[in-house]
């Protein structure tokens, strides 16, 4: 695979889902909204995802699969694609990170890295 520079910028917003969580059973639910921005001059297509979810105990859950939320979106130049998904952890704080396997308009594959971001129950660090 050739080295193709990624024109992708990724923004993440997270939310603790208190109503769906069961603290007594150590089930903490979080949603995350991802915005994938194509800063390049050509369209790109998201082909697959790879997540590493790490809780406060250091337990890791790895998730791989095609697309995101059932889609393999094509993102036009200077536009964005946004989706919301969720995860459950056994601790009130943790981290997610990963990557998207992308394809450019020439059919060349490249990786868009998702930097680590924190999932935390509000007030946990006060």
UniProtKB/Swiss-Prot annotation:
GO terms for biological process: error-free translesion synthesis. Signal peptide: none annotated. It holds the Pfam family DUF525. Gene3D superfamilies: ApaG domain. It comes from the Bacteria. Residues 2-126 form the ApaG domain. NCBIfam families: PRK05461.1. PANTHER family: F-BOX ONLY PROTEIN 3, POLYMERASE DELTA-INTERACTING PROTEIN 2. This is Protein ApaG. It comes from Shewanella frigidimarina (strain NCIMB 400).
